[in-house]
Amino acid sequence: MNICFFGVGGVGGYYGTLVTRYCNDTGKGKTYFIARGRHKDAILEKGLLLKKDGGKEEIRVNPFFCSDTVDGLPVMDVVVVAVKGYDLKGATHEINKIVDGNSVILPLLNGADIYERIRQHLKKGYVLPACLYLGTHIESPGVIFQKGGSGQICIGKDPSFPEFYPERLLQLFKKAGILIDFFEDVNIEIWGKYMFIAPFALVTATYGKSIGEVAHDENLSVLVKNIMQEIASIAKALKIGLPSDIAETSFAKASQFPFETKTSFQRDVEVKGRQSEWDLLGGTVIRYAERFNLPANNTKATLDRLLQDVDKR
């Protein structure tokens, strides 16, 4: 099998390391990494190092190929897309060059409308809606650090090809030591996760507060809950079968994080000049609300304030 990891930052690097180790040990596949800058250079020089489970286990691998371009690559059996939301459109155009009708595309991004975003520009292959539970980041060029999360990937059917079952992908990832599960309706998992990350990301970034500070603030906690209700209304309009108490249970998850935890979106926003996934986390909600004529006043006001503050820097 030919497996491309398009983006080998925290997420792509974690799964890319595990799959590469399996392929190198068994000879049952080749991995191709698409990376950039000093990270790419470090991988070419000394391989990619994963510090798994907080550094308890270290795994170093050398992919079959690593470059910042797909030019000259063969058709891929699997493409794992692990870029930031703002790079997705450009990545999709490049991925078009290395897939055919039999390729499986697995997007591992935050967001509730990733499938639709990809299908706007990629008509070939099987695109599997997915979400994941993983806390990783690039510690230094060529080094990935896992700080939390089970690493579970939840995947579902391609709505355009509902009869397709990704047996080869599932077996490959499981043999590589990855926790991956197939769901008949993965949208419940995707929107359930989005229900937590989008409101907390927007509010923590806009007001410069940690997850714990937001959860314990009288006004900001109400704002988070209101945004959650707006997202729940959209999910209902999309006929996604979320539990009736999804907003309450999602908010309660904040207590599972250390009080001082910042969201990754918040950390991106705090770095002047760095791009962020504001459209993925806020713009999506506003567009869906407009489509279904639903209120999204809290989401819009929060996002507007955030973007105004960023523009002033």
Residues covered by each model-derived region:
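NAD(P)+-binding Rossmann beta1-loop-alpha1 motif at the extreme N-terminus of oxidoreductases
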Residues: 1-58
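NAD(P)-dependent Rossmann-like dehydrogenase/reductase catalytic/cofactor-binding core
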Residues: 2, 29-30, 174-175, 223-313
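A structural signal for isolated positions on well-ordered beta-strands in alpha/beta enzyme cores
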Residues: 2-4, 32, 106, 154, ...
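Short, well-ordered alpha-helices that flank and scaffold nucleotide-derived cofactor binding pockets
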Residues: 17, 21-25, 93-97, 120, ...
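Rossmann-like NAD(P)(H) cofactor-binding subdomain of soluble oxidoreductases
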Residues: 57-143
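Rossmann-fold dinucleotide-binding core
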Residues: 74, 110-189, 193
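Helix-loop-beta segment of a Rossmann-like dinucleotide-binding subdomain
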Residues: 99-102, 144-154, 205-214, 262-270
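Active-site-proximal catalytic alpha-helix in oxidoreductases
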Residues: 187-212, 219-232, 258-259
